[in-house]
Regions:
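C-terminal helical subdomain
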Residues: 2-12, 19-60
Length: 60
């Protein structure tokens, strides 16, 4: 199984935090890891090969 992940946003870290006036404006590394794990564990009857991860506040 091959999967393609698009990480479209900054990743929160101890050295790089989000502004106080923009909560949830950066991706949480633990949430990214959980998304990878979920793809690994997905059932074969509902298969994906691409997943895009963006912060909640991003406008389309």
């Amino acid at each position: 199984h091959v999967a393609h992940f698009v990480i479209d946003g900054g990743i929160r870290s101890a050295a790089r935090t989000e502004p106080a006036d923009k909560p949830d404006s950066m991706l949480d590394p633990d949430a990214i890891a959980l998304s990878y794990w979920n793809v690994l564990q997905q059932p074969r009857s509902a298969w994906t090969w691409e997943l895009e991860l963006r912060p909640w506040v991003e406008k389309f």
